[in-house]
């Protein structure tokens, strides 16, 4: 896997709805990987789809503690970079992504620009690695090269 993120990666668009459906597969993990921008919309749609799949598996398996390995890896990656964040999830009505901090719920669009950029960047990398390694117990053990131009731009420490 090879990913490239340029200096124009500020997240300006936090979607409130999904306009078109994407196919998420090992092959599409590399889709637009060399473009110089972040796409929060695709990350949001993938996250929502994985949550739906995870909830379906909980019901089928009658295992209410079931966690989808790919989604769990992305959750951990995203949460590791957001101070005091306990959970990240999608609310359905109205449709939005939220971060739970200190028992309070914040919409992603309420986060600072640096936090949104960090979430989008780490979420996109983790999503692509998870999609590229669907058979691994821990998809984050996959390998790749990630180029980030001006790493500190729009990022929090």
Where are these regions (language model features)?
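Switch/communication elements of ASCE P-loop NTPase nucleotide-binding domains
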Residues: 92, 96-157
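A generic secondary-structure boundary signal that marks alpha-helix termini
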Residues: 14, 83, 127-131
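Short coil/turn segments at secondary-structure boundaries
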Residues: 17, 90-93
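Coupling/switch segment of ABC-type P-loop NTPase heads
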Residues: 1-79
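A structural signal for short, well-ordered beta-strand segments and their strand-loop junctions
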Residues: 3-6, 87-90, 98
């Amino acid at each position: 896997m090879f990913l490239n993120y340029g200096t124009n990666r500020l997240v300006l668009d936090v979607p409130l709805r999904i306009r078109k459906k994407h196919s998420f597969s090992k092959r599409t993990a590399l889709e637009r990987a060399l473009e110089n921008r972040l796409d929060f919309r695709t990350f949001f749609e993938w996250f929502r789809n994985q949550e739906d799949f995870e909830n379906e598996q909980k019901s089928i398996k009658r295992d209410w503690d079931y966690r989808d390995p790919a989604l769990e890896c992305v959750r951990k990656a995203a949460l590791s970079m957001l101070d005091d964040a306990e959970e990240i999830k999608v609310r359905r009505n109205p449709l939005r992504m939220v971060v739970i901090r200190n028992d309070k719920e914040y919409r992603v669009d309420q986060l600072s620009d640096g936090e949104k950029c960090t979430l989008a960047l780490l979420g996109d990398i983790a999503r692509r690695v998870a999609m590229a390694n669907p058979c691994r117990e821990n998809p984050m053990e996959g390998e790749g090269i990630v180029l980030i131009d001006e790493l500190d731009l729009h990022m929090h420490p």
